[in-house]
């Protein structure tokens, strides 16, 4: 079970010392969006992820892939592949902020996620002042949808 909240972050509110935090390079593509079926490369590891419907709480299954399997599925992804750097920032109460900084063509999009052990913990979470809009329960809560909205704004 995945229980998380998501927040948009503005560039001017990003922590100044991002590279001092542990981070990973990610590339991902969506094979399906309803339900979410995603392939992801995280550094030198590869995964197939299934996510059930839901906003703050949903089922999530991560299955390891070989590099060959990932490369085979890559061309089947819907739309372009998404590249980003994920920074792991320690947060109060033993939590971790996963801050995604997207590469082109979505450069300028920053999304923070915080995972919780219970819905009660998630609902009582008071985010840091540098967080922006809470998009957990909006139609924008899925990264894929965020990217489509960001793409539309840049096309105007």
Question: What residues fall within each predicted segment?
Answer:
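Charged surface patches that recognize polyanionic ligands
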Residues: 8-14, 18-27, 31-111, 116-141
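Conserved small/polar residues in nucleotide/adenosyl-binding loops
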Residues: 145-152
